[in-house]
């Protein structure tokens, strides 16, 4: 299952259901950007028991915004060029991600306005969703992996932006390999 990047509420509940199905049935899953965010929402709803968990993009008045707007975007009304864009360092600590990349630090391209709400990170990780990739400050979550799952990975960045025919994205290649097993 590949849940790509995107914006807005259209199809979001179906994407959340896809993440749940892949998680529960141990089906290989790769979420990219919005797919990363919605995998976090699904986990918060169904594993943490926060039934109203959501993204503040989808429910601005929600009580459990496990995905929230980037602090530097709060109050910005003009949506032109308001995203976190470009190549940023991702620090990887263990898990499948470090194995796939063969490195503990990589640069990947970003295009997003929302991120994992830091208030929920410890609760999420205590239940088995690990953020094995973080930005250079350690504050922003970049890669998630599920414990005890053959391949459930997601990235806040867009690995497809750097993928080439002769050098595919490690996360996409990992998904294909997991699907073949």
Q: Residue locations for each model-derived region?
A:
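Cysteine-nucleophile active-site neighborhood
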Residues: 2-88, 95-96, 165, 171-180
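Acyltransferase
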Residues: 106-181
């Amino acid at each position: 299952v590949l849940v790509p990047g995107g914006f807005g509420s259209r199809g979001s509940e179906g994407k959340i259901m896809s993440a749940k199905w892949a998680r529960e049935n141990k089906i290989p899953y790769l979420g990219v950007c919005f797919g990363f965010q919605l995998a976090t929402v699904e986990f918060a709803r169904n594993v943490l028991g926060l039934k109203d968990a959501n993204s503040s993009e989808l429910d601005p008045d929600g009580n459990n915004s496990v995905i929230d707007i980037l602090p530097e975007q709060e109050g910005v009304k003009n949506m032109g060029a308001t995203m976190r864009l470009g190549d940023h360092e991702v620090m990887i600590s263990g898990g499948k991600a470090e194995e796939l990349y063969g490195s503990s630090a990589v640069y990947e391209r970003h295009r997003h306005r929302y991120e994992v709400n830091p208030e929920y990170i410890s609760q999420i990780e205590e239940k088995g969703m690990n953020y094995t990739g973080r930005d250079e400050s350690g504050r922003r979550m970049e890669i998630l992996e599920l414990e005890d799952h053959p391949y459930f990975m997601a990235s806040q960045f867009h690995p497809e932006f750097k993928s080439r025919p002769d050098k595919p994205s490690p996360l996409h290649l990992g998904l294909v390999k997991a699907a073949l097993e």
